[in-house]
Amino acid sequence: MKYSIEDLIQIMNDLRDKCPWDKKQTLKSLKSLTIEETYELIEAIDKEDYYEIKEELGDLLLHVVFYSKIASEKNHFNFDDVVESLIKKLIYRHPHIYSDVKALTWKDSYF
């Protein structure tokens, strides 16, 4: 079976509703775990272990979804808002792709 980001968001909703540990987490309680996952990703990159890179990227994606869920419970923002904000930032930072501005070198295109 192939899963989607919507499945991940639904699983996070289920975990926040039904799992005592997940229910208890806050933005602050997840910080050290996020740092740990980031270091694990860096180690996997240093080893060029693509399987581990994939796994650690998944762990970080889980954290993005987790933080978004916690924020949505407090009516601040949700995962879709995070995606929209990122897309707007990428478009803004790449006018040489999304407008008439021309970048002559890679340095011209680096925000």
Where in this protein do the model-derived segments appear?
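Flexible "arm" and connector segments at domain edges
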Residues: 1-56, 62-111
